[in-house]
């Protein structure tokens, strides 16, 4: 397979041509995960360390969470939250394939799980050293790759995404330990 380093991410590999990912050597053995180059940068910027407690607030499909686990050398704790339990099944399938042992899934909307200052789930009761919040977005940034999206976006849907992002930021910031990073 002809491949080379990506232009920005220090951990990325770019294939010379497209192919079936699941047929690539090492895929089934969990030696890599396919992710956009920009997505690879986020876990690197969070500067996680082995032994830390980390929250991946909008986790599915799990690429960033499994990357965090690798950076943590599979030591510590990652709580992966997503609104859709079916999407968390995909996160856990990726964890099994990649050998991630430190991730615990939690299905639910963080805005409801944390609420108005009341943490309603024991996995969220202790503060986190690091929090990754890749909040759901409008998708406007990928219109070049998915131009059909312009037919589905409305000013109202964009405003709803913005409001959700603000609410998620407010909720996750309350879960961060003093001196932690979000």
Positions of predicted regions on the chain:
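S-adenosylmethionine
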Residues: 1-182
């Amino acid at each position: 397979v002809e491949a080379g380093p990506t232009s920005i991410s220090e951990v990325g590999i770019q294939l010379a041509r497209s192919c079936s990912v699941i047929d690539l050597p090492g895929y089934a053995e969990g030696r890599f995960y396919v992710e956009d180059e920009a997505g690879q940068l986020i876990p690197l910027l969070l500067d996680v360390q082995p032994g830390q407690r980390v929250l991946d607030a909008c986790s599915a499909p799990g690429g960033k969470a499994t990357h965090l686990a690798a950076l943590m050398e599979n030591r510590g704790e990652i709580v992966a939250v997503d609104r859709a339990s079916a999407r968390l099944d995909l996160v856990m399938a990726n964890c099994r394939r990649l050998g991630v042992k430190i991730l615990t899934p939690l299905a639910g909307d963080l805005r409801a799980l944390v609420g108005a200052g009341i943490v309603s789930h024991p996995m969220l009761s202790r503060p986190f050293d690091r929090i990754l919040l890749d909040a759901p977005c409008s998708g406007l940034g990928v219109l070049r790759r998915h131009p059909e999206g312009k037919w589905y976006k409305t000013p109202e849907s964009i405003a709803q995404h913005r409001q959700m992002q603000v609410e998620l930021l407010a909720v996750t910031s309350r879960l961060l330990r003093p001196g932690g990073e979000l």
